[in-house]
Amino acid sequence: MRVRRSILTILGFALLASACSGSDDPASPTAAPTGPSGSSLSMEVASSDLAVGAAQHFEVGIFSSDGQGVELLSFGQLSMGFSYLGDGSGTARPGPQAVGTYVGAYGTSQGGSEPTFTDPNDARGIYLADVMFDQAGTWQVDATVDIPDEGSRTLSASFVVTKEHSLPAPGDRAKPTENLTMDSTGVPPAAIDSRALDGAPVPDPDLHGTTIADALDQQRPILVLFSTPTYCVSLMCGPETDGLEALANQYPDRAVFIHVEIWRNYQKSVVNRAANDWVCCDATGSLTEPWLFLIGPDGVIKDRWGPLFDPDEVAKELAQLPR
């Protein structure tokens, strides 16, 4: 089993997706005109498990790199145009258009109305749009963004859309998984939350109080996040886990909030069974995370986000579900 890693890990900042592994990665970033101070400007598709059918969250990240390091494009909006390439042998067919809105990692700066290059320590995130794909095969996204003092830039990246999702998706029934909880015995605390290393306590025990199976039996809405805050190759998993904790504190009576750690034993590459049930594997045979799933009281998945989610948008969707 592979863990899909973003191209940004090559640059030292896997900021967009903990997913992809070498030459069989379906997403292909393409360098574009230069960025600030002549740096190389690139875009990457952060989403995975894209399939034909209903509109789904599509996420891209844009970064500039030079000998001094990496900066990320943050804030504001950009326009996206999609083209269907099929197997790549024919003429590209124009597809949907969309506007991508910036979503920052939880706890980082969300400010700024215009796209701006930022230090990843200050702001990091993606641009999200809801897009529907009508055919399986290779697609291309062309993103155009107006950057103050830099002008208009257009970047392209290709990605694969499959006939069906490989992972649980909206409309599917949630799997009645017996994930580890604070009451689990015979397991190290780090298997419950990877931050509980070297005697450290589980930092968010309230997110580990029940199993997905028990929560489904309660017939209540569920928000379950699959992430590994310590071993994630991106800088997104920890903030997203904190974001779920914040939602749990703000809406304690609206849903059951669950965090599932990816690794049972990271050093031996042993994945927790619950994580294996839900996020392994995509069409490339890779485990992908982080993923947040919203499950209705009827046990059906209503929405999912990966790798990033907007807590305000999640809260709005949660509020629409019956208690």
Residue map of PLM features:
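Bacterial signal peptide processing site
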Residues: 21-24
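Short active-site neighborhood of thiol/selenol oxidoreductases, capturing the structured segment around
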Residues: 193-196, 203, 212-233
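C-terminal motif of bacterial Sec signal peptides marking the signal peptidase cleavage site
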Residues: 16-19
